[in-house]
Amino acid sequence: MNQSILKIVLVALLLPSFGDIEKEYIQSIPGTKEKVEMVFIPGGTFTMGSEKSEQGHFGDEGPQHQVEINPFWMGKFEITWDLYDLFVARDIDRKRPQQLNGKEVDIDIDGVSGATQPYTEMSFGMGVEGYPAICMTQLAAVKFCEWLSAMTGNFYRLPTEAEWEYACRAGTKTAYSFGDDPADLDIYAWHEGNSGGAYHQVGQKKPNPWGLY
């Protein structure tokens, strides 16, 4: 699996736990216009990692081994600043439903476990609206998922490494989900050669066979 496709990271990948309904759904965020589009990922078994002979192979991609994955949902796009900034500001927390699925929801936090304002403007002037949230720590991404779970009443988390690769492969066995030819990468992803040294709004390229961007 060529690692060029794995550079879209952070809080993009979320998992709800409200039943195996095999279809896409849209998660609305109470009190806002924001939403998260979710894609159903069917369960299955795949070969994780890549062969040493594969172009672009990294040493940590082996040895190859079989992994069984249960069905789950994954975000169609990366999480954008539009939503992540709401988590950091916490201004909409009071608008969340007081009860969800018959259970009290508590997202009270302290100064350690809550989000903290970044030390600099993290988009670095490249754009915010519709752009993927970047440069947070893994802990911040985990806390975002906890916040989103409390706000919506559905369980969200980051994907495991195996779930991430499985979803990126989308049932294929080639270096990329679209084949082995890196010349086609421009159609599906931004990278050093076509990004102009900046990041871009989500959903601007073609999705993989399972509908993930």
State each model region's role:
Residues N2-V11:
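Sec-dependent signal peptide recognition
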Residues V11-G19:
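Hydrophobic h-region of N-terminal signal peptides that target proteins for export
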Residues I21-F40:
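GGW-centered surface loops in extracellular recognition modules
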Residues Q27-I29, M48-I69, A198-K206:
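Short, polar loop/linker segments at the starts of domains and inter-domain junctions
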Residues V36, N154-F155, P207-G211:
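Short loop/turn microsegments at loop-to-beta-strand junctions
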Residues T45-E54, P182, H191-G196:
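Active-site/binding-pocket entry motifs
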Residues M48-H57, E68-F178, I187:
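Active-site microenvironments of metalloenzymes and redox enzymes
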Residues I187-Y213:
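Short, well-ordered junction/capping motifs at the entry into regular secondary structure
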